[in-house]
Amino acid sequence: MSSCVERYVRGWMTDDLDMILTACADDFVYDDPIDGRFNKAEFADYFRGLGEVEIAWSEAVQEADGKETFWMWWTWKPKGAAESSLGAALVKAGPDGVHSEKVASYKH
C-alpha cells in the first residue's frame, strides 16, 4: 500500500482532516450519492459536518497501471441523529495521491 493511501486511511481513522487532504491528489473528488460531489477544495466543509465516522478497510489492490483500488466500510452517525448509517466506499489512488472516493449507503 502506498504512503498516500496509508495517510488517507489513518486520517479517516483519527478524524484528521489535514492528514486526509495531504493524501489527496489535486484532482480529488469525493462522491456521495446523498450529499453530492465535492472536489478537494470543497471537501473540508463537507468533512466538518459529518459527525462521528468509524471505518474499516481492505488491502489495496495494485493495478497494472500502478494505481491502487481499495474498499472502506463505514458507520456514520450524523450530528444530532439517533441512528447510524452504514455503507462502503471505493477509493482510487495513484502515485500522486488519492484521486477519488465514491460512497454508497446501506442504511440511511
Model-flagged regions — what are they?
Residues 6-10, 22-35:
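Short, solvent-exposed secondary-structure junction/capping segments
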Residues 41-108:
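A beta-strand edge to alpha-helix "cap/lid" segment located at domain peripheries
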Residues 2-3:
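Amphipathic alpha-helical repeat elements characteristic of tetratricopeptide repeat
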Residues 15-19:
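Short helix-adjacent coil turns
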Residues 11-14, 49:
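A structural signal for alpha-helix termini and helix-coil/disorder junctions
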